[in-house]
């Protein structure tokens, strides 16, 4: 047999065995037989000097990386809203029905909420070309070499177009127990073990952990159409992705609640950590209608299992100063394991919280964790507090010794100009990737600039010179020049990035983008009053007050003036909606286009003033149909044939380009 054909046959055979073993849990050959075939494949690869892309030998882990590279996701990875009671789930369904203007029964899909590390897998031309962490939902870190060591994740699929598969990297509880039998340093819990392995620069370390994974959604896809979430899951199964056996369809929220009770009763039998249930609307067209809030999809929610509680000793309380000057008490605890995670820190919200819970240093406290990384102290065990020490209310800032001020239940340091934690946090936020994106700027750098160079405001960043930086510890010629170049490049920035960089309370990335798109100009945003702001979608009264109050602050006004004087040029490309036939129209794109990716054509249409939708109705104005257009094109044709009054037009790619 030809050596290449023999390699192809071995790869196919070994991948089939791995799929049966790691995904279906149905081993069909002995380890000895598998190893023998694997050794034959290695021998052939060495002889031919050729390695097939989906060869299992690619999973062993390559050389250690120097650092993780950033990766921008095609589709946003959203967070989920949360519910803790059946009443909150009922209220969620009521909000959905109100949005849909319908009281019809809704079909939901119920799945486990796994407690591991979120993965976003990119496939092109049938190959796994990228794997990344969630990051901030827009940009994550590439961990493809680490993910390749997960045997359950296919390196190749029978689908050639681009797609992003969302899932969770995990370590089974039984695998952790087996690993710890021979480990020099035993791992404390499966969640940290999985996250630590996937974020280890050395893929060989990842491989030793023998991680698993479950895939649960397709965030982005080209050249295919789905009508339901179940169809997505069937596609994943067909292409041999690891999918949880627990996926239930429920008619109405009452059935969902029944399922949750069943799962809670049996969750201790699971071999993977779960901290809740995810409930999703099954119909994708309904999802399009429901849309998204500023943070969450309206069509999905996470139900968090009843919190677990343990007791431990409160060893100390440290007051920390944040970017806004607010002092927050952080509890240091005797390490304890709760819900599969070892914790040594916990939340105490403010001084009133400390008094209400009657906690003291040295006493035993009740600790609750409900899916959150940082648990909460619920109260003290009174009989352990006799010899404990009262927590002192700060009278001065722990960082700069300024006299503190009270605003409601919170304590603030008013020294915003020279209090180190405040200034360092503001500068780090300003330079962050979602803001001014000054590459190579870290919290350590900000601290050095504050302490060694006396940096007292953000605008002073733009006055730094090579001679200033080269004298700093760990700053060589290249690092100094690169940082100065990055600072200079940040002068030309997008308006929404600049707005976010300013650190307006309650204003995140999306709200900053909404402000930029609506007003189109920094000065107009600064002058906007409460009534102008509160009418914007997703900007309520609290956010509007925050924005108005921020831009009325004399220190803020002065700070912005200094930045503009340094040459900062926030720019925003206003959409010219008067010159395009698509201005104000609803457009649906379906199928694969030759000259445009899905994200690219959506951006182009929005710049033309169009509203891009994912569902067809008689109110749709244009359907742009590419190759392999599916149910959406069929639906558009049915509307036209029905004789209903509509402005709907179907365009192929050439007709679309002719109208631009």
UniProtKB/Swiss-Prot annotation:
UniProt entry tagged with the keyword Manganese: yes
Xref: InterPro entries: BRCT_dom, BRCT_dom_sf, DisA/LigA_HHH, DNA_ligase, DNAligase_adenylation, DNAligase_N, Hlx-hairpin-Hlx_DNA-bd_motif, NA-bd_OB-fold
EC numbers on record: 6.5.1.2
Keyword NAD: yes
BRCT domain span: 577-660
GO cellular component: a single term: cytosol
Protein origin, superkingdom: Bacteria
Entry keywords, A to Z: DNA damage, DNA repair, DNA replication, Ligase, Magnesium, Manganese, Metal-binding, NAD, Zinc
Molecular functions (GO terms): DNA binding; DNA ligase (NAD+) activity; metal ion binding
Active site residues according to the UniProt entry: 113
Catalyzed reactions per annotation: NAD(+) + (deoxyribonucleotide)n-3'-hydroxyl + 5'-phospho-(deoxyribonucleotide)m = (deoxyribonucleotide)n+m + AMP + beta-nicotinamide D-nucleotide
A Pfam family that the UniProt record links to this protein: HHH_2
Cofactor: Mg(2+); Mn(2+)
Its job: DNA ligase that catalyzes the formation of phosphodiester linkages between 5'-phosphoryl and 3'-hydroxyl groups in double-stranded DNA using NAD as a coenzyme and as the energy source for the reaction. It is essential for DNA replication and repair of damaged DNA.
PANTHER family in alphabetical order: CHROMOSOME TRANSMISSION FIDELITY FACTOR 18 (PTHR23389), DNA LIGASE (PTHR23389:SF9)
UniProt record similarity statement: Belongs to the NAD-dependent DNA ligase family. LigA subfamily.
Protein name: DNA ligase
Source organism per UniProt: Alkaliphilus metalliredigens (strain QYMF)
